[in-house]
Amino acid sequence: MTDTSTTSQTTSTSTTGTSGATDHGFSVRPLGQHIGAEIRGLDLSRELAPDTVARIRELLNRHKALVFKNTGLTTDEEQSRFAEHFGPLTAAHPTVRFTGQSSSNVLPVDSESSVANKWHTDVTFVINPPQLSTLRSVVLPEYGGETLIANAAAAYADLPEELRGFAERLWAVHSNDSDYVRPDRVTSDAERSYQEQFVSSAFRTVHPVVRVHPLSGERGLFIGAFAQRLKILGVTAEESLDILRILQRHVTKPEYVVRVTWEPEQLVLFDNRITQHYAIDNYDRQPRKLNRITVAGDVPVNVKGERSYSVEGDSSDYSQIVEP
């Protein structure tokens, strides 16, 4: 199918749903040259037709992050059903457990317990991080609380040729005991409990610094907070930190970032294999809750086809390994 969504005008797609249901045409509007597209007119609370799912996957491969407006989603069950169109679901988290949730697959991204204002890719400390993440708005502050999402493929492509070749030879150790769980300030017992649970079981996995996307073939910088200040194999700790800082600055260049402003009944779907994201802490810690459901992923590979490997921790209860 030809993708016309990168033109300056809004495009439309019409599909027929399963069981006689009809999904009306939906519009696609790019949000930037390198990342992001807004989708309207698609009811995600209903079962989607296979060709609709294929079109969404196609758009995701191109735009890396899709912002669905007026989705019709009101429950975790509906969000789970949408996410399952793309593969088996993971558990909510490898170490953090939540009570009172309707499903073991739902991770509440709640301002009462955590603030994810560090650039990261979800759960890269396990052998097969999620391939996709979905975030659904549940409770929103009066202002602020936007989410930034960065295109790690565009960042890789922007590197000088010599630096690209160097990065392709590197491997990084990702751990759940990282700066991600060391916020600048702890404001409640709930935050302290969340941090303690996050590191309650140790995970360390070695991933390529440049990962090849299994569907698009694109190369992207696979780093972020869980690799930050951790040793890159073959260099000193100080050199590791300097190299990671250089590469990370490319990932978060404004040209490669989309800023998502949250609205009611909104869902964001992003490709966790080739993006990073950051939750802006600019809302005075008003109540803010997004529910996250993730889709099980594959084991990352580098440009030579070499696979990531686990050093510590068993994540089999968190996620099955899927093949692309």
Region annotations inferred by a language model:
Residues 2-267, 273-324:
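Non-heme Fe(II) oxygenase catalytic core, chiefly the N-lobe of the double-stranded beta-helix
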